[in-house]
């Protein structure tokens, strides 16, 4: 459902931010 989509989007966002920080 929508809550699952939010959880998935949040995890993707966290992974993206973490990757950006690691690449700096």
Swiss-Prot record:
Recorded family membership: Belongs to the ascaphin family.
GO cellular component: extracellular region
Stated name of the protein: Ascaphin-4
Tissues expressing this chain: Expressed by the skin glands.
Organism of derivation: Ascaphus truei
GO annotation, biological process: defense response to Gram-negative bacterium
Role, per record: Antimicrobial peptide that shows higher potency against Gram-negative bacteria than against Gram-positive bacteria. Has a very week hemolytic activity.
Subcellular location per the Swiss-Prot or TrEMBL entry: Secreted
Keywords: Amphibian defense peptide, Antibiotic, Antimicrobial, Secreted
């Amino acid at each position: 459902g929508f809550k699952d989509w939010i959880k998935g989007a949040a995890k993707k966002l966290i992974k993206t931010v973490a990757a950006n920080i690691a690449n700096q």
